[in-house]
């Protein structure tokens, strides 16, 4: 692991010190969703502007979502995912064994 400070903490240790398990899990889910959105859009060769036309979600909002600068509503995510041939699904969380 890369050191993030002269004190020797790595990112995982630092993350666990400042966030609780629920916050870490929530952040990981958000990152995975954004990554899937970007990857799907790029694999289809669709620009953010084209996705705006297909989804009805304005390009600046798409950019903010992809940068993780906003927490979009469920309806907005569904509008973005549909033209990419994707949807959301409710599945059990993978929980670390105690």
Curated annotation (Swiss-Prot):
Keywords: DNA-binding, Transcription, Transcription regulation
DNA-binding region in chain numbering: 48-67
SMART domains attached to this UniProt entry: HTH_XRE
Statement: the UniProt record of this protein carries the keyword Acetylation: no
Disulfide bonds: none
Pfam families in the record: HTH_3
UniProt name for this protein: Uncharacterized HTH-type transcriptional regulator HI_0659
SUPFAM superfamilies: lambda repressor-like DNA-binding domains (SSF47413)
GO molecular function: DNA binding
Domain of life, per lineage: Bacteria
Domain HTH cro/C1-type: residue ranges: 37-91
Species the sequence originates in: Haemophilus influenzae (strain ATCC 51907 / DSM 11121 / KW20 / Rd)
InterPro entries: Cro/C1-type_HTH, Lambda_DNA-bd_dom_sf
